């Protein structure tokens, strides 16, 4: 009986609010604010109506119709959306007190139409609000990526942890019992030992995983790490094993997802194609530039345009002497004398160098970004990392290299 009364009230509200069609489009567009803000959420906006706009009854009806668990008469929500000119939007929140408006997800075409509604005062890009955490003291690599300039301040400041994001470490496996990863090891794959657990017997993959998401040494301290073992105990393997690992990830990944490939070899069309297909499946792929002090465009998967290719720097912002360079790079990250987890015990650490060590810094940063923007495409993730990177600080970056150093405001 009470439910029926509520339905009747909703119906009356909507019928009253919908007594006329939305007004004709205005020749003057409503302002669009905050689109360039660092924390802007792609595709999400707050639509604020003018104080004198006759929209409150429709907003109240829509707010009631969206109440969780409330059964509503068919068509009431659609009718309220039509009255407010929101047929093409997905409404997430409705405001009737602090302001009169809605939070919506809309495509660009619908956004343009909303801006022409004369009842709209302005539209603002939705943004993230975050708590802050600081690690002090921090390893130099973490310390470097959260500040624009030297000297280092001994701190790593971060606003996200990568929680809810899945990082696939295509490498030598991971020491599953290491305390850096407690409770955050996800399902893995072993291309070296059929049916194996992807346990690391080399150390390289554990070190990489520690930089991506270790509790002490990691960029993204809450990310879920998936071991994908494609290299043996000597750190060697084949393109066929690497492609097998990529094939498994492409088929079985959980989004939001990022792949780390701190490995490579000579140019390979098959490997490049496997990487591209993983990217086309919606997985961001971060790859090492290589350690031969040569043009990265001669190496796979470093030469894959849609992947994020990473060179290495020293603690003084020089390109590391071993790091590959050139047009196929996207950015640089710390890669010399990096301390992280190791495979010899559950508490072991090691300090090593390479573009393999630079790459997981970027993978961790991608995980931070994906925590806040879980539906971001690989292209959007790459664009964000390049947008925030610090320009023109890498010394001797190498011919045709982009002079960009990883920076993490996330």
From Swiss-Prot:
GO terms of molecular function: serine-type endopeptidase activity
EC code: 3.4.21.-
Thermal properties: Thermostable.
Presence of keyword Repressor: no
Localization (cell): Secreted
Any Gene Ontology biological process: proteolysis
Post-translational modification: Contains 4 Cys residues that form two disulfide bonds.
Pfam families: Inhibitor_I9, Peptidase_S8
Domain Inhibitor I9, residue spans: 45-130
Propeptide: 20-132
Keyword Signal set for record: yes
InterPro entries with a match to the protein in the record: PCSK9_ProteinaseK-like, Peptidase_S8/S53_dom, Peptidase_S8/S53_dom_sf, Peptidase_S8_Asp-AS, Peptidase_S8_His-AS, Peptidase_S8_Ser-AS, Peptidase_S8_subtilisin-like, Peptidase_S8_subtilisin-rel
CDD domains according to UniProt: Peptidases_S8_PCSK9_ProteinaseK_like (cd04077)
Keyword entries, A-Z: Disulfide bond, Glycoprotein, Hydrolase, Protease, Secreted, Serine protease, Signal
All residue ranges annotated as the Peptidase S8 domain in the record: 139-410
Record-annotated active site: 171 (charge relay system), 204 (charge relay system), 356 (charge relay system)
Main EC class the enzyme belongs to: hydrolase
Residues of the signal peptide: 1-19
Recorded GO CC terms: extracellular space
Family membership noted in the UniProt record: Belongs to the peptidase S8 family.
Annotated function: Serine proteinase with preferred activity for amino acids with aromatic side groups at the P1' side of the scissible bond.
PANTHER family membership: CEREVISIN-RELATED (PTHR43806:SF11), PEPTIDASE S8 (PTHR43806)
Protein's UniProt name: Extracellular serine proteinase
């Amino acid at each position: 009986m009470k439910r029926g009364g509520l339905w009747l009230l909703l119906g009356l509200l909507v019928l009253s609010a919908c007594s006329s069609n939305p007004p004709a489009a205005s020749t003057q567009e409503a302002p669009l604010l905050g689109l360039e803000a660092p924390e802007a959420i792609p595709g999400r906006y707050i639509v604020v109506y003018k104080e004198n706009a006759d929209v409150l009854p429709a907003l109240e009806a829509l707010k009631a119709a969206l109440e969780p668990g409330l059964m509503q008469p068919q068509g009431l929500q659609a009718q309220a959306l039509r009255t407010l000119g929101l047929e093409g939007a997905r409404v997430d929140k409705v405001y009737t007190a602090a302001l009169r408006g809605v939070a919506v997800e809309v495509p660009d075409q619908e956004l343009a139409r909303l801006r022409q509604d004369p009842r709209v005062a302005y539209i603002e890009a939705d943004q993230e609000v975050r708590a802050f955490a600081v690690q002090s003291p921090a390893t130099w690599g973490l310390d470097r990526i959260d500040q624009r300039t030297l000297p280092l301040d001994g701190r790593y400041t971060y606003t996200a942890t990568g929680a809810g994001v899945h990082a696939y470490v295509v490498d030598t496996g991971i020491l599953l019992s290491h305390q850096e990863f407690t409770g955050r090891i996800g399902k893995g794959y072993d291309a070296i030992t059929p049916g194996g657990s992807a346990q690391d017997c080399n150390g390289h993959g554990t070190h990489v995983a520690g930089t991506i998401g270790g509790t002490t040494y990691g960029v993204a301290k809450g990310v879920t790490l998936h071991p994908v073992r494609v290299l043996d105990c000597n750190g060697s393997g084949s393109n066929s094993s690497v492609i097998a690992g990529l094939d498994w990830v492409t088929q079985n990944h959980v989004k939001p997802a990022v792949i780390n490939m701190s490995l490579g070899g000579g140019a390979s069309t098959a490997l490049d194609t496997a990487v591209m297909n993983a990217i086309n499946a919606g997985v961001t792929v971060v790859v090492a530039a290589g350690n031969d002090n040569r043009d990265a465009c001669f190496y796979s998967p470093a030469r894959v345009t849609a992947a994020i290719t990473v060179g290495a720097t020293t603690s003084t912002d020089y390109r590391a002497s071993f790091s590959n360079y050139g047009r196929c790079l996207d950015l640089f990250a710390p890669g010399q004398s990096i301390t992280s987890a190791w495979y010899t015990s559950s508490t072991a650490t090691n300090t090593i160098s390479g573009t393999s060590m630079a790459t997981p810094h970027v993978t961790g940063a991608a995980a931070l970004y994906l925590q806040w923007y879980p539906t971001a495409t690989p292209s959007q993730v790459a664009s964000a990392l390049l947008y925030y990177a610090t320009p023109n600080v890498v010394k001797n970056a190498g011919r045709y290299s982009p002079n960009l150093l990883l920076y993490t405001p996330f």
